[in-house]
Design a protein with these regions (language model features):
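Active-site beta-strand/loop architecture of penicillin-binding DD-peptidases
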Residues: 1-9, 15, 24-130
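Short, highly charged C-terminal tails/helix-capping segments
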Residues: 131-148
Length: 148
């Protein structure tokens, strides 16, 4: 549906917005992107753009950081980083935006990225008369009981 009123112009220069959009596109749609493995889709109409984030919860020793790189489950649940992802879609003609924070999710791209992808795709497909296809089994979440 169209907005009941036009979106307010925030005064950003178009060339600056293009730089940000290009960077967010690379995060999700190029193999150099930090969320590429978790948000890549073949259908252009369902592609999104986004930005990953991680919020450190606790100060970690060098040993803890090295262990966490090898296996996040080796770190106590309450000391694991929070995972963040913000995105918009569809890529070519954005209509929807979404942000997800997963407490102690470790990685924004790996944990929160697929959730944002599914939510945005559900909005895109659902509002075009189609049936959303949620792929929950791809979420790579590590919970309190270390069940991946």
């Amino acid at each position: 549906p169209d907005l009941p009123y036009p979106a307010e112009d925030l005064g950003f220069k178009p060339e600056h917005l293009e730089i940000v959009r290009g960077a967010m596109n690379r995060v999700t749609n190029t193999d150099e992107g930090t969320a590429y493995r978790y948000t890549q889709v073949e259908e252009p109409a369902l592609q999104i753009a986004g930005k990953t984030g991680t919020a450190q919860v606790a100060r970690l020793s060098v040993g803890e950081r090295l262990r966490m790189l090898n296996d996040v489950r080796s770190l106590d649940y309450n000391r694991r980083n929070h995972a963040l992802f913000v995105g918009y879609g569809p890529l070519k003609r954005p209509r929807y935006a979404c942000a997800v924070i997963i407490e102690h999710g470790d990685s924004g791209g790996r944990s929160a990225g697929p959730v944002v992808l599914d939510l945005l795709q559900a909005a895109i497909v659902g509002n075009s008369g189609g049936q959303p296809n949620m792929v929950n089994d791809r979420y790579n979440l590590v919970g309190r009981n270390d069940e991946a």
